């Protein structure tokens, strides 16, 4: 790509102030320096400023997280549609957009699953984002409490569904 020791790859990681984000940014910068010889600068700021800058597109590489609001692939995939306000990286792929549009309009679960698989292949090929880690949720639940949802990807707990076992 034309990069070498005299002309290293240079870019900036943009993230909000938080200890975990800083550790991840430092680890990435170190690894990219070691593996690619990249000169990676770190830029951190307070949350409100970070959101404003990120939403205006004032970054080269940004830290962000995605949380599913519902248990369906579109909860993540829709955020990469070129017209989505959640597409802060401004990635655009017309074929991806068309596949997602088609998936949203089909009632056939098998067809929709196949369309999502095709969309995910495009993401894997173009890499508009780099998944770094998944934050695990660890819960300690008193065995006397019943109704606590075990398989709950959104981590929503409605207290009206909880009860004390006798």
Q: What is the meaning of each model-derived region?
A:
Residues 1-30, 34, 90-95, 118, ...:
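Append "and occasionally in soluble cytosolic enzymes with long acidic Gly/Pro-rich linkers
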Residues 1-20, 62-65, 107-143:
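Bilobed periplasmic-binding protein-like "clamshell/Venus-flytrap" ligand-binding domains
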Residues 2-8, 53-57, 75-105, 134-166:
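Short, solvent-exposed loop/beta-turn-alpha elements that line the ligand-binding surface or hinge
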Residues 13, 33-81:
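Periplasmic binding protein-like
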Residues 16-24, 42, 46, 65, ...:
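Extracytoplasmic/periplasmic, Sec-exported soluble proteins
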Residues 20-27, 31, 49, 72, ...:
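Extracytoplasmic/secreted proteins, especially bacterial periplasmic and envelope-associated proteins
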Residues 22-27, 56-60, 145:
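Short glycine/threonine-rich loop-to-helix capping motif typified by GTGT followed
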Residues 31-34, 40, 104-105, 110, ...:
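Conserved C-terminal helix/tail region of periplasmic/extracytoplasmic solute-binding proteins
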